[in-house]
Amino acid sequence: MFSLKRQQGASFEHQARLFLESKGLIFIAANQNFKCGELDLIMNDKETIVFVEVRQRSHSAYGSAIESVDWRKQQKWLDAANLWLAKQNMSLEDANCRFDLIAFGKTPQDIQWIPNFLD
């Protein structure tokens, strides 16, 4: 059985997927796990593969959802994306891709989309 935190995370990831689909992106995959980390969502935006990190913070005692994506998390995100691309016979060097952040506040309606978060 999923923990409450995992259930909440899955709910926010689902809301992020619906939000991005409403903006025209097409779902490819979710929850792709690698030793170095997880890719929450992988979407397609026209000819671009979009690796989406979904973050949520119910209060700011430990910083905002955006602030929680520190250098270490960014490196894990890049490494996981490169491993996923390798499974598709691609790499970060030759694939048209970007890294977007979906940050939630307390509720699924409190959503912020930051395309090209890693630039």
UniProtKB/Swiss-Prot annotation:
* Entry GO MF terms: nucleic acid binding
Q: Which domain of life is it from?
A: Bacteria
Q: Which family does it belong to?
A: Belongs to the UPF0102 family.
Question: Cross-referenced NCBIfam families, in alphabetical order?
Answer: PRK12497.1-3, YraN family protein
Name the HAMAP family on file: UPF0102
User: What's the protein here called?
Assistant: UPF0102 protein HI_1656
